[in-house]
């Protein structure tokens, strides 16, 4: 039995699939509210600012992620276990930037949904798949960093790269499975304004006439794609912090200087992944909170105030911006990636020359990697350290 909601005085929502009226005044926790159209639509200055922001996110994000992916595939020293996950993360971000972000920008230009029922389902599926790939990959990366800190010199099997590719593929499959219900329930609905004799279509991610389903959808999304993964990541980083603290206390006096360098190296690598996690948490929190507010507070969709409009725009832009910040976070944290990034950006031919092995400092965190020109797999520097630029001593193989 549908749970009827109070009807907005000047709007009626009807499903175009069954052409039956529903008294819900909401459209989607991700699409529109009354303040976006009609008399309450933003002025030309606001629209210009919105489109410029979206254009910057799309162009900068595509450029940054494309270069990151190119660096990974063209530079053998970057093809390591953690960097496979980081590249998978970039692929998910690139998918979102090429599809969902441009479509979202059309909401401010057109009076409704332009991409039909199939487009509604496909784009809903892509959006949630990309979010799942991001947060689940960060969770696996945190587990990988924990293992590297606890057992830094453990020799990994020769097929570690292949296994990591399989894990990355499983993350994509799992994300798609979680996104399927949203694709199934997504539908196009028509928003009718009797006062202006106007109708417009919008894509909703759940049956809009079912208030309970709206609440369940928002709550499950918040738990599965935010709270639970970040809680797991928090546990791993608590264990990492405890391990690093104990290793500092147990450093022998005669090896104080050398061991402290190893501990500092561990901290730098863990910090890289932690920065990516923090960026995800910061960028997606406002969007999740706004979705919960819209789903559990009926009158939220009738709020046509400028403040509500600004908060809505801010949460969406911040969420999409997460898809373009990771390459620049790596650029900031990694001298090696800075050089590779600049080389690819300015179309330099070939890879940058590798620095002399004897002149490079020790990085004690080891994972499996391949040495260029050989088929043997050895203990080597941690994959993220390739981005950080902490190659290894002469006696050790460098990624």
From Swiss-Prot:
Keyword Cell membrane appears in the UniProt entry: yes
Lipidated residue numbers (S-palmitoyl cysteine): 347
Segments passing through the bilayer: 42-63, 83-103, 122-143, 164-184, 221-241, 273-293, 314-333
Protein location: Cell membrane
Disulfide bonds: 120-203
GO molecular function, one term: bombesin receptor activity
Cytoplasmic side: 64-82, 144-163, 242-272, 334-399
GO cellular component: plasma membrane
Carbohydrate-modified residues: 10, 18
Membrane association type: Multi-pass membrane protein
InterPro entries cross-referenced by the UniProt entry: Bombesin_rcpt_3 (IPR001560), Bombsn_rcpt-like (IPR001556), GPCR_Rhodpsn (IPR000276), GPCR_Rhodpsn_7TM (IPR017452)
Tissues of expression: Mainly in uteri of pregnant animals.
Pfam families, alphabetized: 7tm_1
Principal localisation: membrane
Side of membrane Extracellular, spans: 1-41, 104-121, 185-220, 294-313
Keywords assigned by UniProt, alphabetized: Cell membrane, Disulfide bond, G-protein coupled receptor, Glycoprotein, Lipoprotein, Membrane, Palmitate, Receptor, Transducer, Transmembrane, Transmembrane helix
Subunit-level organization: Interacts with C6orf89.
Function: Role in sperm cell division, maturation, or function. The relative order of ligand affinity is GRP = neuromedin-C >> neuromedin-B. This receptor mediates its action by association with G proteins that activate a phosphatidylinositol-calcium second messenger system.
Name listed for the protein in its UniProt record: Bombesin receptor subtype-3
Organism: Cavia porcellus
